[in-house]
A protein has these predicted regions:
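Acyl-donor (CoA/ACP) binding surface of acyl/acetyltransferases
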Residues: 1-20, 24-30, 63-159
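Bulky hydrophobic/aromatic packing residues
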Residues: 9, 14, 49, 56-57
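Conserved GNAT-fold acetyl-CoA-binding loop/helix
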Residues: 30-52
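A short helix-loop-beta-strand connector motif used in the catalytic cores of GNAT acetyltransferases and
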Residues: 53-65
Length: 159
């Protein structure tokens, strides 16, 4: 399902044909360094097939494939809270290193957030960022996020 089409990119649901490009672009240590440990590295075709299969099984679209020139080059994903936090969602994203610093991530993120608000009952979206990932902080600020707190010594990546 296509969600948004712009000059620079398309946002859509993940498709089986995206396995090769997902594997190619996500098998990057620089990206892995900024994601949660649940993301395997190295990233294999089997990892990609499992991710795409799980994304397609969900009843509500929560993983948006970023497509440039017909190639899947990134993801914007939402994870809903449970119980009393069910109207909250955490957003996470990555884009192929080849497309860093081109403005695609912030524009696509804004579109994905708008779509998610319009098609779910979520009323609050938040994000967490490693303190060293200044580029991701700028992306979030561009789309209107405000820093509401700092979790000191709350998570560790690579030791």
């Amino acid at each position: 399902m296509i969600v948004v089409t712009k000059d620079l990119y398309t946002l859509r649901s993940w498709e089986g044909q995206d396995t090769e490009s997902l594997t190619l672009h996500l098998n990057n240590k620089k990206i892995w360094d900024n994601c949660r440990d649940g993301l395997p590295h190295p990233y294999t075709k089997e990892n990609a097939r499992c991710f795409i299969s799980q994304a397609r099984e969900k009843t509500e679209i929560s993983d948006f494939c970023i497509v440039v020139h017909g190639e899947a080059i990134g993801n914007i994903g939402f994870v809903r809270g449970a119980d009393v936090e069910r109207f909250n969602a955490e957003v996470g994203y990555w884009i192929s290193e080849r497309y860093w610093n081109q403005g695609i991530t912030s524009e696509a993120l804004a579109d994905a957030i708008q779509y998610y608000f319009e098609h779910t009952e979520v009323i609050r979206i938040f994000a967490t960022v490693y303190e060293y990932n200044l580029a991701s902080m700028r992306v979030l600020e561009k789309v209107g996020f405000k820093k509401t707190g700092i979790f000191r010594k709350a998570c560790y990546k690579n030791g």
